[in-house]
């Protein structure tokens, strides 16, 4: 399991006031999917808390060095699923003088080091759907796209059947 952690208060020397850049690093928790399902939620939360406590200036610098050393080959976390929620980061609220952004997207799908990250993203500031929901950005290997499409079609079909049954 991997999550993104804000490190703006951890780096030494501190970042300058008003710094506007990436201040997140991926943090990993070694946990098999079966263990995640079988364990109580409190046990998983304790693992996440412990992993957060291990992140310090040295961790951040090591992460930056690793990124620089392996930039050309791409960074991968192997068989890790990464989920990150960007809905409340505030990117959609920033006004550069011409209003809020129309879209907020990651620059790279490899931003978390995962081969298949999933981002929960807000709609743009002017988008009416913003109040009712959010976008899901999923990065898949090309070989998985067809199966993903089939799964989504099946999900939509089931949803349409359920909503039409409710109207009878």
Regions found by a protein language model. Name each.
Residues 1-168:
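Acyl-CoA-dependent O-acyltransferases
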